[in-house]
Amino acid sequence: SKADWRTFVVLGDGELQEGSNWEAIMFAGHKGLSNLTAIVDRNRLQQGARTEDTNRLDPLGDKWAAFGWEVCEIDGHDYNALYECLAGPRGDRPRVVIANSLKGKGVSFMEDRVEWHHKVPSAEQFDLAKAELGAAK
């Protein structure tokens, strides 16, 4: 019988540079693990580089679909879109939500900058970031 719970996996697109992830993706699709949902933070950045400078991941949704997954691609900053993907009717396959996002969104000096993947802000930068995020509300 099918499991009556759902399992969620959250991963970054940089992790998709690793073969073991694709082995697991292929296995889950082959076995029809319909209670499994993966959420990919597709910000196109990883430790030290842009993902596309390491290995080209696009067309990412087509790759997941080829391994038997339902694909839901959204604006990763749109919480309603995320909810719709997660709450939508379930099929007989695992589901992936590809959440296209912008690392550092809302903070001018952090947006889409590789170095902020691991960098710690100074006290001044932290205060500026808080102010910018507060102004965006």
Where are these regions (language model features)?
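Glycine-rich ThDP/TPP pyrophosphate-binding loop and its adjacent helix/strand module
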Residues: 1-137
